Each structure stands twice: as structure tokens, then as C-alpha cells.
Amino acid sequence: MASTRDIRRRIKSVKNTRQITKAMELVAASKMKKAQQAAVAGRPYAELMAQMLATLGDRVEEAQHPFLVQREVKTRGIILITTDKGLAGPLNANLFKLVTDIQSPAKYVVVGRKGAQFIARTRRDLLAEFQVSDRAAFAEVKVVVEFMTKQFIDGVVDSVEVIWPRFKNTLVQIPTIAQLLPLRGVQHAVESLQHGTGVSAPRSPAVEAQMLFEPDPVSVLSALLPLYINREVYHQVLDAKASEHSARMVAMKTAKDNATKLLDDLTLEYNKARQAGITQEIIEIAAAQFAAAS
């Protein structure tokens, strides 16, 4: 049995660990709420964009915008959204399984240090690495999107897909892969907006009649599609941030609970060791008294 001094040292260490994991759990919970609030705050913007795209789709034939051009896919472009830090449970590992399943030629743009390390370790083709802060500003995401869309327009990649952890609830984050480019049409973009954010785009004739597009609907559509692409990836980054903080909150809660259980076990072990020591001292005193009396 370990000495009481060793057990006390272990108890102190476990208490410190439990305190740290509890603090990290609370921080992750706060950040998760902020990411969810940011995603909800973007819904009015997404709803208006869906309505505008739906109206434009009715008024113009789909122009040969570079984002709409379908071509043979020889090289896939993948935007991989991961975390910068660890301690997020199996979140990143589940995303890496999706990457491992990709057998066709692909080039990667990675958001997050963990993803960049994985791509480098597995010797995949890394085009660029970006970091996005916890607050995930739109301008930060826009830089990522502009880089990847340029690769698509220049023919470096023939399609663009996004891999990210989709937030379902606090306990469930689903590793997801979705095509971003080329777009499958304006109507598909509208449906993607509605499905991705839960918004609706009511087709009100009165509202549509009030929409004037200058200089012309085709030009507006050409300007609106890049905004749509930026908004899609921005929403996916917010989704990934909520998933990251949720996974970390759950992981830290599990660690805290395990530390509490270990602390209970160590306290019991300490009490047993202390009791054994006291009993041994009593036996030795009694034996000494018996020997003296004899």
C-alpha cells in the first residue's frame, strides 16, 4: 500500500486537474453559446439572400458564371475545417476518417492547425493553411473562400467541397462533406440556404414586384453568387466552432467527472492507509506494554 504522503500528493494533483477541467468546461460552454448566437444572427441575411436568388432565378436564364460551369472533375479541392487545439474528444479524428476515404486526386485548403498537421503527416497536397479566431469574423472566412474560388476559376481544382463537423446538438457533431462549387443552379443554392440555416424564403408576389435589380438581373446574379459562397462557408465555420466548443465541453466534463471519481477512490485509500497506520501503532504500543509487564 502506498504511503499516506504519496496518496496526499496524488490527491492534491487530482484536485488541481479537476479545477482546471471544470474551468475549461465553463469556458467551452460560453464559447459554444456565442457561436450558436452568431449562427442564428445570420438567418435574416440568409433569408433575404434566398429570396433574392429565387427571384433572380425566375427572371433570368442561368448565365455562364464561372461558379455555374460544370466540368470533368480531375482534381478535387477540399476545404477542411478543423480545430487549432486538442482536447475536443474524437471531433478531429472523425473528420480525418472522411479525408482518408477520399481516394481521387485532391488538393486541400485547411482551416485549423490540427487539420494542417494531419495533411502534412499523411503527405497530402496542401495548398494553404488558415487560422480563424473563436469569434470567426466574416472577413477571416472571406480570405479562405477567395483563395479557394481562385483555384477553381484558374483550373487548379475542378470542384470545391467542404469537410466540417456539423453541429446537431451538444452531444452530437456529425462529420459532413458537401459540394460548394460548381453550383448546381440558382434553385439549388436557394434550397441549400434554406436547409443549412432553417430559414424560409416565402415567395410573396408583392415583395418580388418591389425588387428592382440594377443595372440588370444578370449582373446582380453574378455579384450575388460570390456572396452566397462566402455566406455558405461562413455558416459552416460557425457550425464547426459550435461543434468544437461543444465537444470540448463534453470532454472536459467527462475528465472532471473522472477526476472526481478518482479523488473519491484516493480519499478512501488514504483513509484506509491512515487507519492501518493507527492500528499498527496501537498494536506496537500494546505489544510493548505486554512485554514490559512480562
From Swiss-Prot:
F-type ATPases have 2 components, CF(1) - the catalytic core - and CF(0) - the membrane proton channel. CF(1) has five subunits: alpha(3), beta(3), gamma(1), delta(1), epsilon(1). CF(0) has three main subunits: a, b and c. It comes from Opitutus terrae (strain DSM 11246 / JCM 15787 / PB90-1). Belongs to the ATPase gamma chain family. One of its GO terms (cellular component) is plasma membrane. This is ATP synthase gamma chain. Produces ATP from ADP in the presence of a proton gradient across the membrane. The gamma chain is believed to be important in regulating ATPase activity and the flow of protons through the CF(0) complex. Pfam families: ATP-synt. The lineage of its organism: Bacteria, Pseudomonadati, Verrucomicrobiota, Opitutia, Opitutales. It comes from the Bacteria.
